Every structure is written in structure tokens, then in C-alpha cells.
């Protein structure tokens, strides 16, 4: 059964469809429509969440809730085969246009008719809605267990989502899923269709679903437009947390940069990061990201100069072209 993501707008979807139908480059469109919603769906900076990740070139990836294909086109460059699932025909049409090398499937997210198993499964801003489409006593745990059935033996599930206790929500940002102030901080009172989680809450869900090998990443300033990918190893040591590129109307209750410095000194940054990117691994073998402790992404320059810098667990620093 299709469900309504609270941030969706039918008029905006029609505009996005028309833009995608007529353009392959959205630079002029974003200059004219310099609003968060257009950047969220069309900006190339959306790719930065995964542009650094060492996907297996010969691998396969399933993106559940691919939206308007804002990440799908990147995945087709990273792996051999990409499947994208959406629950509305209009979204499927947009994805097909933006990521022509992907296979797009119109499907409910809890009734996926695929026999193939994948190396990677990606959910970005979708897992939070599992209680809307999984009818069970424990929808989030049960949905993770359901997704395991589509993974290869050493596969990975990625969850990209906001932190219910993200610092920006205390500082005056509206919660993206509800367009309300403090809805997550206050525990989603009277909101039954969606919820985000604190670090301990999402960790409990992951543990209960039987995952014993997983890694938290902390995209800063958020997972929509990340410039820095922190990990538990260095999040409180390297105090650079990036600068938010897109700020909608908001209340400014305090200086987030200053409080971020305090949180780092108190070893608390991982609990108040605005977002999580979580790598859930189905085996206990070594993974290529084990030694990656910090990634800084630079894609705001001419394309030929785009790079990402990695600090590794052995102390080495590498710079790689994008």
C-alpha cells in the first residue's frame, strides 16, 4: 500500500517532472529556483553522501524509496547493476529519465517482488516511515529482517536518516518530515506515521534485528548536503562540522558552531549530530571501510578539481579525485 511522505508536494512533483523531462543539467534551474526543495531534489551535492564510498564496481545495489532519483544516477556510476523502487508511477518516470541505466520497479516497499539478491540496499529518508507500511508490533525491527532476504551473504544495508536529537532541531530548525518545530525532540506527539531516532534508539533497533557488525557515520552538516563524514573514532577530535549550505526560514536560538565545539570537548558530538549514515553488515568479515575514520568532500569547485580526503586508522591521509 502506497503511503504519503509528509514532506511531499504534488505541485512540486509536477514541476520536478517537467524540469527533468526537459533538462539534463539543472544549474540554471537551481539558480532561478533557489529554494531548499529544489536543491534537495536536483542539486549535485546530494551525491556527496555516497560519492566517497568504495562500492564494488561489479556489485549490485537496490535503492528503496528512490524519490526523484537524486541518488540513483550516482549509483549507476558506482556499481554494475542498480534497481530502484518507488511506490508511485510518477516517481518511477522521473527516476527512469534521470538514471537510464537503472531498473525501476513500481512496488510497495514491504511487498517487493524480486528474487535477485544484492550487494547493497540503500534507504535514504525512508526507514523513518516503516511504521506506515509495515503492519506489525515492531515495524522497524521487522522491516530490517525483511530486507535481509534481499542481501547477498556479505551484503550491506545503508540507513541514511536524521537524528531525532540533532543539534539543529534544538537550535530552531523545523523537523523536515513534519515541518514543525521540536516535533522529534518532543517525541512526535500525535504523529503516528513517521519517527526518527536518537543514536541509542536506532542502535537498539539494529541490535534487536540481529546485526552485530555495523558502523556509524555522522555526515555534517547533514546527510542531505554533507561536506564531512565523521566516525566515532574522530568526531570529538576533529572539530570541523561543515557549514549548512541551505537555510530555510528558522528561529535562531543559539550559535550551533559554538555549541558543537563544546559537545566535542565533552565527547558528546555523536549523540547530537544532525544525521546518521549507518552501514549494516551481514557478516563479520573485514570491510573496506573499516579503516576510514574521517572523510572531507570537496565538490564545490570545477569538476576536474573535485576530491575527497580520507584519514585512515593507521594515521595515513589520502586525497582521491572524484
Question: What are the residue ranges of the model-derived segments?
Answer:
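N-terminal auxiliary segments of SAM/dcSAM-dependent transferases
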Residues: 1-22, 303-306, 311, 316, ...
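Conserved class I S-adenosyl-L-methionine
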Residues: 57-67, 158-180
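Conserved SAM-binding loop of SAM-dependent methyltransferases across substrates and taxa
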Residues: 68-79
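Class I SAM-dependent methyltransferase SAM/SAH-binding core
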Residues: 77-103, 108-110
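A short glycine-rich, Lys/Arg-flanked "PGG" loop and its adjoining helix->strand segment in the class I
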Residues: 138-156
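Short alpha-helix
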Residues: 192-210, 214-216
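Rossmann-like AdoMet/SAM-dependent catalytic core
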Residues: 201, 215, 219-316
Amino acid at each position: 500500500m502506497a503511503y504519503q511522505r509528509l514532506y511531499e508536494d504534488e505541485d512540486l512533483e509536477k514541476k520536478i517532472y517537467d524540469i527533468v523531462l526537459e533538462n539534463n543539467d539543472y544549474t540554471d534551474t537551481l539558480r532561478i529556483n533557489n529554494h531548499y526543495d529544489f536543491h534537495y531534489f536536483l542539486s549535485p551535492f546530494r551525491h556527496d553522501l555516497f560519492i566517497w564510498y568504495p562500492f564494488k564496481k561489479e556489485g549490485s545495489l537496490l535503492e528503496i524509496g528512490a524519490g526523484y532519483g537524486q541518488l540513483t544516477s550516482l549509483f549507476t556510476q558506482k556499481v554494475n547493476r542498480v534497481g530502484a523502487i518507488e511506490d508511485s508511477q510518477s516517481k518511477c518516470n522521473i527516476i527512469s529519465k534521470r538514471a537510464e541505466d537503472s531498473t525501476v520497479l513500481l512496488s510497495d516497499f514491504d511487498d517487493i517482488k524480486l528474487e535477485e539478491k544484492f550487494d547493497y540496499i540503500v534507504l535514504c529518508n525512508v526507514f523513518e516511515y516503516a511504521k506506515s507500511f509495515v503492519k506489525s508490533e515492531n515495524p522497524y525491527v521487522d522491516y530490517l529482517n525483511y530486507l535481509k532476504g534481499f542481501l547477498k551473504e556479505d551484503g550491506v544495508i545503508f540507513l541514511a536518516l536524521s537524528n531525532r536529537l540533532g543539534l539543529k532541531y534544538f537550535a530552531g530548525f523545523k523537523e523536515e518530515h513534519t515541518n514543525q518545530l521540536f516535533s522529534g525532540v518532543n517525541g512526535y506527539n500525535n504523529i503516528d506515521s513517521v519517527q526518527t531516532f536518537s543514536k541509542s534508539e536506532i542502535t537498539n533497533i539494529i541490535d534487536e534485528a540481529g546485526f552485530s557488525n555495523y558502523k556509524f557515520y555522522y555526515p555534517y552538516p547533514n546527510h542531505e548536503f554533507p561536506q564531512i563524514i565523521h566516525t566515532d573514532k574522530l568526531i570529538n577530535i576533529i572539530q570541523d562540522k561543515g557549514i549548512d549550505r541551505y537555510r530555510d526560514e528558522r528561529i535562531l536560538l543559539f550559535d550551533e558552531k559554538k555549541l558543537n565545539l563544546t559537545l566535542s570537548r565533552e565527547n558528546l558530538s555523536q549523540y547530537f549530530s544532525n544525521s546518521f549514515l549507518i552501514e549494516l553488515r551481514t557478516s563479520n568479515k573485514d570491510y573496506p571501510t573499516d579503516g576510514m575514520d574521517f572523510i572531507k568532500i570537496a565538490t564545490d569547485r570545477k569538476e576536474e578539481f573535485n576530491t575527497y580526503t580520507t584519514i585512515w586508522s593507521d594515521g595515513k591521509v589520502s586525497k582521491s579525485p572524484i
